[in-house]
Structures are given as structure tokens and as C-alpha cells.
Amino acid sequence: MNSYLEFEKPVAQLEARIAELRSAAEGDEVDISNELKRLERKSAALLTSTYSALTPWQKTQVARHPQRPHFRDFVKHAFDEFVPLGGDRNYGEDEAIMGGLATLRGRKVVLIGHEKGNDTESRLRHNFGMGKPEGYRKAIRLMDLAGRFGLPVVTLVDTSGAFPGVEAEERGQAEAIARSTEACLALPVPMVATIVGEGGSGGAVALASAERVLMLEHAVYSVISPEGCASILWRTAEKAPDAAEAMKVTAQHLLDLKVIDRIVKEPTGGAHRDPSAICETLANAIDEELDALADLPGETLRRMREERFLQIGG
């Protein structure tokens, strides 16, 4: 069952009407197929027009949709033979950041990403995708393995930001984020990062400092959440829509600013409406990018990463 966002209410009303008609038609001899088709066309057209004109704040809501596919969904539908690897070999395990060995279109890769969870229990277990120091150190360990064994690195970024708790600070959160970013930039193998939902602050950059950065059509990427920005500038989170507009958080804005390299189109109505379709589309896009990078020497890859970040804002 779809969970509707506030701006989707007209679509929700139409789809509810369609469901009522279908239910009423069961066992009824009256033919209402034409009316159903008319309403379905109207609903599809309304959904298309709504999603073709989303504001940055509405895109932020879509990026946070509770039914949006997360790391485990992409593992299930886009990758094969996933072997999870856990722990940072120093403090412990962090399930907000997952990783391991996987196969993408026959190519062995090291896969790393944020997992938010999809219900109360799993969200608590995965800490809502907010990585802790041990999570980023685990990512560093996996990137080191990738470099040693010549495996390309694929990252799926979806976090509101790194965990800001006192215990994370005590264990060196800032250092872990910085080291993870450094590990990305120093990799001697190809790296493709994708912002699949929220890309929040350094917690996202630590897994997204790649030579190729992709972004799903309705994902967002920023240094702070719109609510956080609004609270600082206007002393109220109610100005979040204005903050989202000003911060240029959308894939379309970030492509123009050369922060990302490619937008991956989502199904009409967002990735949550057809998770298997977006997984297939993203798998194809990542595979294409890895093909283009496969024969480049390590020094060239490192230089590409350095140059892409130095030219941002230039």
C-alpha cells in the first residue's frame, strides 16, 4: 500500500476512487471498465505532471519517503552474490553503514552504503542511516581491501548525516569521516558513488568522494538539512522550503553546479513506486560508468577525483 506525501493528496484521492470502483465491481454485472480506464489515465497524467514540477522541498520529502528503497533493497535487486563484511577491527560493528563483496553484471566489486531501515525495529538497529566512527572505519577497511585486490568500489549514499551523539564524538567521529574521505580520494581502483536518497553533510561526502558521482532524480545532497539551515538563518524550521530552494539541493541544480556527474531517472512517482525498476536502472548506470573507468591507471583516477573537487564552485 502506497504512503502518500502531503503534495500527493489529489493523486491519493483519485487512486482511492479507483480502488473503490474495483472493489464495487467485484461480482457486479455492471461494466465499469471504461470508467476505470478513464480514471487510471487521469491518475497517471496527474502523477506525471506533479512529479515533473516538484519544488526542492518536495524533492526532499520524496528522498525521505519511508518506502523509498535503501541499501538492502539495492543489494537484493541490483547486485548478486553479496557477502557482507562487518566490523572495523578496532571498536565494533555499525549497522548504519553496510558493506561487503558483491557482483554487478558479472563484475566483482566492493559495495558500501548507508542503510536506514524500513520499519521501527530496523530503523533503530541501523540508527536511521546515521553512521558512527566504527562504520566509517569499516568503510576504510573495505576500501583498503578493494585497493589491494584490484576491485572497483561502489557506494550508495543515503544519510541525513553522521551520528552526532557524544559517544560518537568521543570515539573520533570527525577523524573517522576525514579518514574515510581521504581513503576515497586515494583509491587506486575505480570508484562510483550514487546519492540514492539523502546526502547529508560530511557523513555523505565520506562515502561519495569518487571520480564519478551519480544521483537519483529525486534525491537531495547538501551540507545541512533544510530544517537545520532554516533554524540557523531564520530561527524557525518552518522556513525549510525556502532553505531548500536557496541551498540548491536537487540533482538538477547539482548537475549544473558540477557537484555530480549524472542524474539517474526514477520511475514516475518516485523510486518508492517501483523499487525493482530503479534498481535495474541504477545497476545499468553504474555498470556503464565502471566500464568507462576500467582501464584507467590508479594515478589517473586519483587525479580525476582531485580535479573534480577542486573545480567545484570555480
Curated annotation (Swiss-Prot):
Keywords: ATP-binding, Cytoplasm, Fatty acid biosynthesis, Fatty acid metabolism, Lipid biosynthesis, Lipid metabolism, Nucleotide-binding, Transferase. GO terms for molecular function: acetyl-CoA carboxylase activity; ATP binding; carboxyl- or carbamoyltransferase activity. Its EC number is 2.1.3.15. One of its GO terms (cellular component) is acetyl-CoA carboxylase complex. It is an enzyme of class 2 (transferase). The keyword NAD does not apply. GO terms for biological process: fatty acid biosynthetic process; malonyl-CoA biosynthetic process. InterPro entries: Acetyl_CoA_COase_a_su (IPR001095), ClpP/crotonase-like_dom_sf (IPR029045), COA_CT_C (IPR011763). It is found in: Cytoplasm. The keyword Signal does not apply. Component of the acetyl coenzyme A carboxylase (ACC) complex. First, biotin carboxylase catalyzes the carboxylation of biotin on its carrier protein (BCCP) and then the CO(2) group is transferred by the carboxyltransferase to acetyl-CoA to form malonyl-CoA. This is Acetyl-coenzyme A carboxylase carboxyl transferase subunit alpha. It comes from Erythrobacter litoralis (strain HTCC2594).
